[in-house]
Amino acid sequence: MKALEWMGDSLKILDQTRLPVEIKYRMAATYEEVAEAIEKMEVRGAPAIGAAAAYGYALGAIGYSGELADLPAHMEKVQHRLAETRPTAVNLFWALRRMEDRLRDQHEAKELAEIRQALVAEAENIAEDDRRVNRLIGEHGNAIVTAEANILTHCNAGALATVEYGTALGVIRAAQQAGKKVHVYAGETRPFLQGARLTALELMNDHIPVTLIADNMAGFLMQQGNIDLVIVGADRIAANGDTANKIGTYSLAVLAHAHGIPFYVAAPTSTIDLKVPSGQDIPIEERNPKELREVFGVQVAPPEVPVYNPAFDVTPAKLITGIITEKGIVTSPYSVNLLKMMVRS
């Protein structure tokens, strides 16, 4: 299963809200359809959102039929619509900046077709970069996995969250491919159940041993000595190493620290936002209260009960053992070492 696939004039998006019960695709032929798919979390995961937005931007040019001189104004509207879909995942903005830069490079183009072709090519480059980067993350991350390891992960940072292979699950895949004996504990990840619906499905399809647990069981597992390592993905990493990831990640980091268990973040350098000094400056998306009051359309709480539903939390850098990127593994002091790595790259 691929999270997304370019079909030449449309973007084929796997509707992840239907998994694992049903495999259904959306054929997005306009940038608005791509934006809706991102907002509804049909496509999710920071790298996949970035790639989808890039293709959506290209579709904005493909669907434009006005004068060439008016294209920049139209594309600004396209950029704004895509940028407002998910405020926390920085890969979205990174990909859109690349697309805007490519559009500016076409200022001497005489035909719309030439510009459209260039934008599609850049979106394809972004997707291909993600495939390559995730493999490298897996290779570097394999070094932290022992010959036998029980690994806890949260949410879904696998192939379904990226163009291919995954970040946190990419490390696990690389370890298995290296002949290591890994067993994964996947937290269900309330309220959207990405761990239960997506991570468990991915790992079972790859024949990687996995046990599903409720989110509130993690501490007990650690206390029993059943967890050797925690690996999670990221939606935005601040300059000081503070990391925004799916809600519940911070709790796992605190528990891992209390039990002396290494806690790693796996993410591409495109997820690192040096413009954001610390986690306090990362915008946190809040989602629809219905996601807590209902489970798959079934009411599980009083319909009028007030709900607080942040999609992400921030794990302080002091709780993170290392950040696994395509350039290598970065450790503390993150404010120094992240900058060094980004300058080198």
Curated annotation (Swiss-Prot):
What is the top EC class of this enzyme, as a single word? isomerase
Sorted alphabetically, the keyword list is: Amino-acid biosynthesis, Isomerase, Methionine biosynthesis
Task: List the EC numbers from the record.
Answer: 5.3.1.23
InterPro entries for this protein: IF-2B-related, IF-M1Pi, IF_2B-like_C, Initiation_fac_2B_a/b/d, M1Pi_N, NagB/RpiA_transferase-like
Q: Name one GO molecular function term.
A: S-methyl-5-thioribose-1-phosphate isomerase activity
The entry's substrate-binding residues are 44-46, 86, 194, 245-246
Q: What processes does the entry annotate via GO biological process terms?
A: L-methionine salvage from methylthioadenosine
Q: Which gene encodes it?
A: mtnA
Q: Which reaction does it catalyse?
A: 5-(methylsulfanyl)-alpha-D-ribose 1-phosphate = 5-(methylsulfanyl)-D-ribulose 1-phosphate
The record's SUPFAM superfamilies line, in alphabetical order, gives: NagB/RpiA/CoA transferase-like
Active-site residues, record numbering mapped to chain: 235 (proton donor)
Q: Where is this site: Transition state stabilizer?
A: 155
Q: In which pathway does it act?
A: Amino-acid biosynthesis; L-methionine biosynthesis via salvage pathway; L-methionine from S-methyl-5-thio-alpha-D-ribose 1-phosphate: step 1/6
Q: What is this protein for, i.e. what is its function?
A: Catalyzes the interconversion of methylthioribose-1-phosphate (MTR-1-P) into methylthioribulose-1-phosphate (MTRu-1-P).
**So what family is this one in?**
Belongs to the eIF-2B alpha/beta/delta subunits family. MtnA subfamily.
Can you say what this protein is called? Methylthioribose-1-phosphate isomerase
